[in-house]
């Protein structure tokens, strides 16, 4: 997910996206802890996407 794509979304859409990412992160962490996760790079990608969305929400709140 690109930051430019996220910048076009409204704050409500970003909150929805954040909720989806946090759910996905939880599921990936559960899979990793049980040894079922084959693609461990997804944890890093989702964590960074969460950070991107939170950053944009903070920017929009300040603007």
Swiss-Prot record:
It holds the Pfam family Ribosomal_L29. It comes from the Bacteria. GO terms for biological process: translation. GO terms for cellular component: cytosolic large ribosomal subunit. One of its GO terms (molecular function) is structural constituent of ribosome. Keywords: Ribonucleoprotein, Ribosomal protein. InterPro entries: Ribosomal_protein_uL29, Ribosomal_uL29, Ribosomal_uL29_CS, Ribosomal_uL29_sf. The keyword Ribonucleoprotein applies. HAMAP family: Ribosomal_uL29. Belongs to the universal ribosomal protein uL29 family. NCBIfam families: L29. This is Large ribosomal subunit protein uL29. The gene is rpmC.
